[in-house]
């Protein structure tokens, strides 16, 4: 918890200073590397952690060292992780994918925006001070064309995005030569198909089958391609967004950059306050990762927060507005059907999803079927024209342990499976959202039900939280469930911060949530047996056994916290080379004792070997030279 609570003015000033002074930067003793592909412009960024050599012998005056290989790791920070790139938030990021989009020849620039709301915002001079200056001219598919990665995959095309992803998912492990580092335990994948080497062809085939998605709106060319699917690395989403009572554009951009630095694979902008449109433009133009939204939130703002006043026309206009800004995936609560709402009446906590409750209220007040369900094909037509992926929302997810795995939850899930098939008719990419609050023994059923009824479309879950008794620590309660469901096959985990159920997260809360979920995702990758997942663990264990403290800090998910905890008790520079830590001290360090045992055993082996040779020499009569047949 922060020691001093800042005022709103101080928070905004701090965020503005962060933006004004933002520079590309690497983690301690890391450097940015790029691995090139065959398609023009495919340069895949990774972070390479530099390690110190291991002392293997020699004398104090002339020590002998053995080099340790640098460890390449997946990097979501985009240009913000490259010290060589000049960052200017006012101008936005470079449009990495623009040449690839243009080369396909199936899009056209729009001379007029499709959304009436966008037109009104652009015409409002009073918003000039808030507006992002370099507004993108949006594109859409030419008439008769679909521009989704699923469409290309089904046609057998390997796009530059697919090659980029294949290189990225392999995490540079082909650069690692050490057998010690490459050693990996077999995983238990629960039916997932994890190849030894991820190729662009494999990426294409998984997308074509609907088992994976590449969220990549043609109007978000700044994003670096990534993939969500159970046969790939488990991904983590971070939520940001302003509300009616707190946060500003500056703070949301700061949270975006902060999120990508700490490992967010995607970011959802859940803004519900003022200037949603302008905030989103700033976020998209500065985001190297896909951005998702829940369009019903903004649609509700347009009708002054009155759910009953929502209409398909308002919602459709919102979809067009956001698609032309560059939103990469929409959460759509189209599975909350009128007949399912009564199923929640006996729940302890009712309907806890904001989107789900909005649609349930609309259905009941009009006594009509959910207009998102009724107009789902039109939603798909819009998504196909911009390559917006659909994240089919779990509006009836359980909000408490008692309500887990109930009739309403699974009824909605089955409907999401039906909608998945409809979306695929339009070549629209789909993932399925999941719970929620589920005790550990009931988690796996969620994965098996999703795979069966949603046709192996990627699963994307909020946790799940495994107990309800720990407000303030729900990043832990949910991290447990997240690791489990990630192992069972969940493709992306939506982070939970310490502020869950309590308030809007700040910058530090975002970091805590992300670190917790990166741990959960990595633990799931290890358990699944994702190729190369264990390399970093092996490097850490080797550094730990050899008391290479600096390397231990730098290999950590959070080097700064690891160093700070160590230095609380051993702050002197000598503590960075000591063969012990403050937990056990020099006389009781198990690893130091293990090293001594290993050295002793090696010496004993030599002595025993020499004794055996001596006895053998005497048994042969002590002759220096033996006849050939005796040798």
From Swiss-Prot:
Residues at which [4Fe-4S] cluster binds: 581, 584, 589
Cofactors that this protein relies on: [4Fe-4S] cluster
A Gene Ontology molecular function term of the record: 4 iron, 4 sulfur cluster binding
UniProt binding sites for substrate: 239, 268, 297, 333, 353-355, 394-397, 433, 460
One GO term (biological process): thiamine biosynthetic process
Catalytic function, reaction form: 5-amino-1-(5-phospho-beta-D-ribosyl)imidazole + S-adenosyl-L-methionine = 4-amino-2-methyl-5-(phosphooxymethyl)pyrimidine + CO + 5'-deoxyadenosine + formate + L-methionine + 3 H(+)
The organism's place on the tree of life at top rank: Bacteria
Keywords: 4Fe-4S, Iron, Iron-sulfur, Lyase, Metal-binding, S-adenosyl-L-methionine, Thiamine biosynthesis, Zinc
EC number(s) stated in the UniProt entry for this protein: 4.1.99.17
Enzyme's top EC category: lyase
Record InterPro entries: ThiC, ThiC-associated_dom, ThiC/Bza_core_dom, ThiC/BzaA/B
Record-listed Zn(2+) binding positions: 437, 501
Metabolic or biological pathway, per its Swiss-Prot or TrEMBL entry: Cofactor biosynthesis; thiamine diphosphate biosynthesis
One GO CC annotation: cytosol
Cofactor notes: Binds 1 [4Fe-4S] cluster per subunit. The cluster is coordinated with 3 cysteines and an exchangeable S-adenosyl-L-methionine.
Subunit structure: Homodimer.
Similarity comment: Belongs to the ThiC family.
Functional note: Catalyzes the synthesis of the hydroxymethylpyrimidine phosphate (HMP-P) moiety of thiamine from aminoimidazole ribotide (AIR) in a radical S-adenosyl-L-methionine (SAM)-dependent reaction.
Entry-linked NCBIfam families: PRK09284.1, PRK13352.1, thiC
UniProt protein name: Phosphomethylpyrimidine synthase
Native source species: Escherichia coli O81 (strain ED1a)
Phylogenetic classification of the source organism: Bacteria, Pseudomonadati, Pseudomonadota, Gammaproteobacteria, Enterobacterales
